Swiss-Prot record:
Keywords: ATP-binding, DNA replication, Nucleotide-binding. GO terms for molecular function: ATP binding; ATP hydrolysis activity. This is ORC1-type DNA replication protein 8. Transmembrane segments: none annotated. SUPFAM superfamilies: P-loop containing nucleoside triphosphate hydrolases, Winged helix' DNA-binding domain. Belongs to the CDC6/cdc18 family. InterPro entries: AAA_22, Cdc6_C, Cdc6_lid, ORC1/CDC6, Orc1/Cdc6_arc, P-loop_NTPase, WH-like_DNA-bd_sf, WH_DNA-bd_sf. ATP binds at residues 66-70, 218. It comes from the Archaea.
Length: 442
């Protein structure tokens, strides 16, 4: 029974000291762990700013949650600090997250407004793309000196818009039709897709002349150090059981080597302890958090980390895997992708694009592939599988904005799949037409 005379918000938080460090996207650490080599590459690439040369274009690759943005912010801060001490003109814009930009116009519009005062902001529409590029060049020339523009998740910008932007900006200094004469422009692009540059148009790649820095997943030992650092800041003294951080690190390492996932586990475990009124966070709280965090994590991928085409491909791969045939070939994935995209009113891309989407999902640790030799038939084909439990993926899809793409009879097919897995039953091969008729698309 609730005592109406007491305010339920009275009292203090006995578990958390401050939760911001657990929100990795909004917190910049003052210590960087296990990225010395990547930082050295970064410093080498940006040293030209300090010694008086034009800034290099730098592209940073790696899966989510492996320190790309944190390291970039840290290096940015150190570069600005050194430039100020040496009286070197330097303006840094960003990181700007590109997740929601669907055109070069929208991105350039935002960049213009980053340079402008609040009372002189450019409206979201009303100009041509050439005009907003011209406004950007004017702003860059106005500040002069070295200008570094940092774009996070640059791979989320649609290909046409990406090619337009990455072709125009780096050549602005050399283009006599722009007002840039004194400023020197460099671009830092952060991408979850290792093959990001490979799919750019040849003229764009030639213009960029970029330096590349690649970030790999963390292992369990590295994650323990990193999560321990964040936990010391986020939690009150002596509330964490000794197994909490190692368990969160081990789980995250098994999944994707992702710091972000480990931080979510710690936050969720702390919330469970607080809800119970416990004195501290235990191993049991942490295990409970790992059980619930998987669907939350996958839902976040559907809603935030994946483009719509990647999300549909991910769902199609999962559906192909749980069919009686239990084989997610590229052809089968594409057939399912086409069906769910069409049935949900979304654009259907070409079969060639499926390879690109699957590569991107593989880079993010969501799918993996195996090459199969077709023997006397000749040739090879790739078979894909998802790295998470298909049940969790489908549950996440049903809770996401892609629920309309999930076949209405998915639970029945999933139930048969789980029964087959439990009994090690091997279903007979079926034709593509028979497989296609399994699903009920609305």
């Amino acid at each position: 029974m609730v005592d109406v005379n007491e305010n339920p918000f009275d009292g203090t938080d006995s578990i958390f000291e401050r939760k911001q460090p657990l929100k990795k996207d909004t917190f910049t650490p003052d210590t960087i762990f296990h990225r010395d080599e990547e930082i050295e590459f970064y410093i080498n690439a940006l040293q030209d700013v300090i010694v008086g040369h034009d800034p290099n274009n730098v592209f940073v690759y790696g899966p989510t949650g492996v320190g790309k943005t944190a390291v970039t912010k840290w290096v940015r801060d150190k570069l600005e600090e050194k430039a100020e001490a040496e009286d070197i003109p330097l303006t840094v814009v960003g990181p700007i997250n590109c997740r929601n930009y669907r055109s070069a116009y929208a991105l350039v519009n935002t960049l213009v407004n980053e340079f402008r005062d609040p009372e002189n902001q450019l409206p979201e529409s009303g100009y041509s793309t050439d005009s907003v590029f011209e406004f950007l060049y004017e702003e860059i020339e106005a500040v002069g000196g070295n200008v570094l523009i940092i774009l996070d998740e640059i791979d989320n910008i649609p290909a046409d818009a990406r090619n337009d932007f990455l072709y125009e900006l780096p050549r602005a200094e050399a283009n006599e039709n722009t007002p840039i004469t004194d400023a020197k422009v460099g671009l830092i692009g952060i991408s979850n897709d290792l093959k990001f540059v490979d799919v750019l148009e040849p003229k764009v790649k030639s213009t960029l002349g970029e330096r590349e820095i690649k970030f790999g997943p963390y292992d369990a030992t590295e994650l323990r150090d990193i999560l321990g650092y964040y936990a010391d800041i986020a939690f009150r003294e002596d509330v964490l059981g000794e197994d909490v951080v190692p368990l969160a690190a081990a789980f995250s390492a098994q999944e994707r080597g992702d710091v972000r996932q480990g931080l979510r586990i710690l936050e969720k475990a702390g919330e469970y302890a607080r809800m119970e009124g416990a004195e501290g966070v235990t191993e049991a709280h942490t295990r409970r958090a790992t059980d619930t965090i998987e669907t939350d994590e996958l839902l976040d991928y559907f809603e935030h980390d994946l483009s719509s085409q990647q999300a549909l491909t991910y769902l199609a791969t999962t559906l192909a895997l749980i069919e009686p045939k239990h084989e997610a070939s590229t052809k089968r994935i594409y057939n399912l992708y086409s069906s769910i995209a069409e049935s949900s009113g979304r654009r259907v891309k070409s079969e060639r694009k499926i390879y690109e989407f699957l590569d991107q999902l593989s880079m993010q640790g969501l799918v993996r592939s195996a090459e199969r030799n077709l023997g006397r038939k000749g040739g090879r084909k790739y078979i894909y599988e998802v790295t998470d439990d298909p049940t969790d993926i489908i549950n996440a899809a049903l809770q996401s904005s892609y629920s309309d793409a999930v076949p209405s009879n998915v639970n029945g097919i999933l139930e048969h799949y789980l029964e087959d897995e439990a009994t090690e039953f091997e279903a007979p091969d079926t034709t593509d037409d028979e497989q296609q008729n399994l699903w009920q698309f609305t």
